[in-house]
């Protein structure tokens, strides 16, 4: 028991070293954590910001641009630097400012090769049949530019920049 009493004063007198394991941004006095623009600093620094032409710590204007310049300590307004807000007339505009997120349910079948054929070629085939401009084997007497293409030419044309694929 007496040994413990003798060790306590020695332990209290020894300097202790400590290593901080917390991150720098989590410290108590870390001002980078909170954006407090134009609020920090002493009265002397704030007075220098107001009076000096080019203070060492400029006043943060938060993105607002000046509409003039300082000439001999006086602020001169420049009309060209004042922004004009041009609002267009939207009375006949078909677009509305709010679009509902509740879009109508659209059910569409899978687009097949038959659908593609009907969309592109069926109208011309029916017109050629009614006009009687088909040959005995079913090929047209006067083929269009798309019908004259070979399979390799059509393949290259479909892969070209500006086609419907891209």
Swiss-Prot record:
Pfam families: MRP-L27 (PF09809). Its main location: mitochondrion. GO terms for molecular function: structural constituent of ribosome. One of its GO terms (cellular component) is ribonucleoprotein complex. Residues 1-26 form a transit peptide. It is found in: Mitochondrion. Keywords: Mitochondrion, Ribonucleoprotein, Ribosomal protein, Transit peptide. The keyword Mitochondrion applies. It comes from the Eukaryota. PANTHER family: LARGE RIBOSOMAL SUBUNIT PROTEIN ML41 (PTHR21338:SF0), MITOCHONDRIAL RIBOSOMAL PROTEIN L41 (PTHR21338). Belongs to the mitochondrion-specific ribosomal protein mL41 family. Component of the mitochondrial ribosome large subunit (39S) which comprises a 16S rRNA and about 50 distinct proteins. This is Large ribosomal subunit protein mL41. It comes from Drosophila pseudoobscura pseudoobscura (Fruit fly). The lineage of its organism: Eukaryota, Metazoa, Ecdysozoa, Arthropoda, Hexapoda.
């Amino acid at each position: 028991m007496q040994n413990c009493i003798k060790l306590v004063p020695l332990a209290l007198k020894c300097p202790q070293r400590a290593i901080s394991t917390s991150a720098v941004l989590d410290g108590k006095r870390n001002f980078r954590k909170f954006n407090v623009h134009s609020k920090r600093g002493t009265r002397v620094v704030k007075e220098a910001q107001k009076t000096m032409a080019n203070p060492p710590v400029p006043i943060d204007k938060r993105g607002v641009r000046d509409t003039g310049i300082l000439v001999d300590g006086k602020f001169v307004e420049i009309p060209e630097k004042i922004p004009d807000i041009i609002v267009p007339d939207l009375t006949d505009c078909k677009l509305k400012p709010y679009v509902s997120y509740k879009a109508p349910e659209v059910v569409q079948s899978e687009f097949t090769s038959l659908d593609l054929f009907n969309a592109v070629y069926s109208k011309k085939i029916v017109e050629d049949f009614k006009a009687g401009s088909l040959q005995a084997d079913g090929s047209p007497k006067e083929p269009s530019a798309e019908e004259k293409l070979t399979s390799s030419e059509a393949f290259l044309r479909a892969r070209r920049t500006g086609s419907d694929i891209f």
